[in-house]
Amino acid sequence: MAKRMPAKVAKKAAAKPTLLSGGNPQIAKGDGDAPVQAYIAAMPDWKRDVGRHLDALIVRTVPGVRKAVKWNSPFYGVEDQGGWFLAFHCFTKYVKVTFFRGTSLRSLPSGESKLKEVRYLDIREDEPLDEAQLTAWVKQASLLPGWRT
């Protein structure tokens, strides 16, 4: 006969998100700020600070930004643009920021994609982040037509 866990221990174990490949949190899909904050809280180590910083920068730069978690990643969009302009995802050594219409940004983000319009920015623990450039990309991306899921 299997041993049962006490209810408090079982509830605590169930509440802790699973980390997928590369340390990406497995968070149930959902709309709004709550699932995005759950994702950020579950990001491992230094990546959690990056997630908080990205979220705050996006909220500050794009008033009224729309948020959701889809495919275990936070997505950001603007209602009038009809879709998503940005998402991010944890990998082992970096946090990847995806600009869905990245090839339309002035001064392209460095990461290329197999997808025609997508560009990436990889944020690594020991590399400086150009805050002014990131803010400019977020602002520009939010004004472009959104990517539809």
What are these regions, as identified by a protein language model?
Residues 2-149:
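Charge-dense, helix-prone N-terminal extensions
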